[in-house]
Amino acid sequence: MLGARLRLWVCALCSVCSMSVLRAYPNASPLLGSSWGGLIHLYTATARNSYHLQIHKNGHVDGAPHQTIYSALMIRSEDAGFVVITGVMSRRYLCMDFRGNIFGSHYFDPENCRFQHQTLENGYDVYHSPQYHFLVSLGRAKRAFLPGMNPPPYSQFLSRRNEIPLIHFNTPIPRRHTRSAEDDSERDPLNVLKPRARMTPAPASCSQELPSAEDNSPMASDPLGVVRGGRVNTHAGGTGPEGCRPFAKFI
């Protein structure tokens, strides 16, 4: 009985000691803070410019002055000191080739898509490839990481919390709804695309043969109405070309 109580007291004392140690030595890494597990933007800056690392859908990696939906990242811890960085919108892993160029990939390769994270004395974070030893950088110059060195400015990052409304990450892509090409009423319900009917003379309604020259009528001697000055009796039933009224034909 006494031994059981003693074991309980020892367990309680150990738990209290562990809590006090954690409070005395908090982990200052932004990866393990309150923002861990949420959306993070990696921010880097110089005296002239500032950028947020973003991974596009085509795998291109660059920087944006402000937070964008493509600069929202998920940083997940793998082993001790190693992280995996993923673009939220592009759904691509941040990877590095043997020349130190960073890119986004849909396929995870432990050798190319894992980075070692270290916090510098100035509070900035650096990420370098354990395979190629190059630093993750938005600058053109690619440099390897050496302990105690001063890394280039565009390879030093600060983790910033996401300030973009979450609804921008859930907006569906517009899709074109296709209908049957035979259903004209659904395709153009307001008849906007249909051409309007035009009034054009139908040549067949006015194709009358000219009177024969053997006929003694005035129309026979002057079929075109040149001598008569084009004056014909319009009440005669429209026997001449001037009296022909073409019918409307819709085309």
UniProtKB/Swiss-Prot annotation:
Species assigned in the record: Homo sapiens (Human)
UniProt site positions, description: Cleavage: 179-180
Organism placement in taxonomy: Eukaryota, Metazoa, Chordata, Craniata, Vertebrata
GO BP terms: calcium ion homeostasis; cellular response to interleukin-6; cellular response to leptin stimulus; cellular response to parathyroid hormone stimulus; cellular response to vitamin D; ERK1 and ERK2 cascade; fibroblast growth factor receptor signaling pathway; intracellular phosphate ion homeostasis
InterPro entries: Fibroblast_GF_fam, IL1/FGF
Modification after translation (UniProt): Following secretion this protein is inactivated by cleavage into a N-terminal fragment and a C-terminal fragment. The processing is effected by proprotein convertases. O-glycosylated at Thr-171 and Thr-178 by GALNT3 and glycosylation of Thr-178 requires previous glycosylation at Thr171. Glycosylation is necessary for secretion; it blocks processing by proprotein convertases when the O-glycan is alpha 2,6-sialylated. Competition between proprotein convertase cleavage and block of cleavage by O-glycosylation determines the level of secreted active FGF23.
Disease / disorder: Hypophosphatemic rickets, autosomal dominant: A disease characterized by isolated renal phosphate wasting, hypophosphatemia, and inappropriately normal 1,25-dihydroxyvitamin D3 (calcitriol) levels. Patients frequently present with bone pain, rickets, and tooth abscesses. Tumoral calcinosis, hyperphosphatemic, familial, 2: A form of hyperphosphatemic tumoral calcinosis, a rare autosomal recessive metabolic disorder that manifests with hyperphosphatemia and massive calcium deposits in the skin and subcutaneous tissues. Some patients have recurrent, transient, painful swellings of the long bones associated with the radiographic findings of periosteal reaction and cortical hyperostosis and absence of skin involvement.
Gene Ontology annotations for the cellular component aspect, listed alphabetically: cytoplasm; endoplasmic reticulum lumen; extracellular region; extracellular space; Golgi lumen
Gene (UniProt): FGF23
Function (record text): Regulator of phosphate homeostasis. Inhibits renal tubular phosphate transport by reducing SLC34A1 levels. Up-regulates EGR1 expression in the presence of KL. Acts directly on the parathyroid to decrease PTH secretion. Regulator of vitamin-D metabolism. Negatively regulates osteoblast differentiation and matrix mineralization.
Pfam families registered for this protein in UniProt: FGF (PF00167)
Annotated protein name in UniProt: Fibroblast growth factor 23
Matching PANTHER family: FIBROBLAST GROWTH FACTOR
GO MF terms held by the record: growth factor activity; type 1 fibroblast growth factor receptor binding
Glycosylation sites: 171, 178
